[in-house]
């Protein structure tokens, strides 16, 4: 059997529970045709780069699948008939990714809780520049400044 990564986008107005039900429907199709789903990742609701069928956001879900091509074809056919699925993409891969996907790792990296204060970064005045002149506010207002 071949290995696949399948990502589908569900409409923003369906609940997370309905997205889980969709995933279970896909699992049933795959398993009935002799395959299995190795991993399911729900990435949450994300903003789309452009509108798809009048939706600006969508639920993203990743499935790692080990199944024959006939099972994938049937799952894609059922997905395209479902009005809650906006887009889908299935890619054949050589090996399934172990652990979290890049999107889930990105979510963990976004915390940035341990960053120090950036401030002036410990730099002093630049020796290659002379000191700044004091600003003359009266001259700036006469010249039509803001």
UniProtKB/Swiss-Prot annotation:
<dbReference type="GO" id="GO:0006412">
    <property type="term" value="P:translation"/>
</dbReference>
<protein>
    <recommendedName>
        <fullName>Small ribosomal subunit protein bS6</fullName>
    </recommendedName>
</protein>
<dbReference type="InterPro" id="IPR020814">
    <property type="entry name" value="Ribosomal_S6_plastid/chlpt"/>
</dbReference>
<dbReference type="InterPro" id="IPR014717">
    <property type="entry name" value="Transl_elong_EF1B/ribsomal_bS6"/>
</dbReference>
<comment type="similarity">
    <text>Belongs to the bacterial ribosomal protein bS6 family.</text>
</comment>
<dbReference type="Pfam" id="PF01250">
    <property type="entry name" value="Ribosomal_S6"/>
</dbReference>
<dbReference type="InterPro" id="IPR035980">
    <property type="entry name" value="Ribosomal_bS6_sf"/>
</dbReference>
<dbReference type="GO" id="GO:0003735">
    <property type="term" value="F:structural constituent of ribosome"/>
</dbReference>
<comment type="function">
    <text>Binds together with bS18 to 16S ribosomal RNA.</text>
</comment>
<feature type="region of interest" description="Disordered">
    <location>
        <begin position="100"/>
        <end position="146"/>
    </location>
</feature>
<dbReference type="GO" id="GO:0022627">
    <property type="term" value="C:cytosolic small ribosomal subunit"/>
</dbReference>
<feature type="compositionally biased region" description="Basic and acidic residues">
    <location>
        <begin position="105"/>
        <end position="138"/>
    </location>
</feature>
<dbReference type="GO" id="GO:0070181">
    <property type="term" value="F:small ribosomal subunit rRNA binding"/>
</dbReference>
<keyword id="KW-0694">RNA-binding</keyword>
<dbReference type="InterPro" id="IPR000529">
    <property type="entry name" value="Ribosomal_bS6"/>
</dbReference>
<keyword id="KW-0699">rRNA-binding</keyword>
<keyword id="KW-0689">Ribosomal protein</keyword>
<keyword id="KW-0687">Ribonucleoprotein</keyword>
């Amino acid at each position: 059997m071949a290995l696949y990564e399948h990502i589908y986008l569900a409409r923003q107005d369906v609940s997370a529970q309905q997205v889980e039900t969709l995933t279970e429907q896909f699992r049933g199709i795959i398993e009935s045709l002799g395959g299995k789903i190795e991993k399911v990742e729900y990435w949450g609701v994300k903003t789309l780069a452009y509108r798809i069928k009048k939706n600006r956001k969508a639920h993203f879900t990743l499935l790692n699948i080990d199944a024959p091509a006939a099972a994938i074809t049937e799952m894609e056919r059922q997905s395209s008939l479902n009005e809650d699925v906006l887009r889908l993409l299935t890619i054949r891969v050589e090996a399934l990714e172990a652990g979290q996907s890049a999107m889930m790792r990105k979510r963990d990296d976004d915390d940035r809780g341990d960053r120090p204060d950036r401030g002036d970064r410990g730099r002093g005045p630049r020796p290659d520049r002379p000191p700044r002149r004091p600003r003359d506010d009266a001259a700036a207002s006469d010249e039509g400044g803001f």
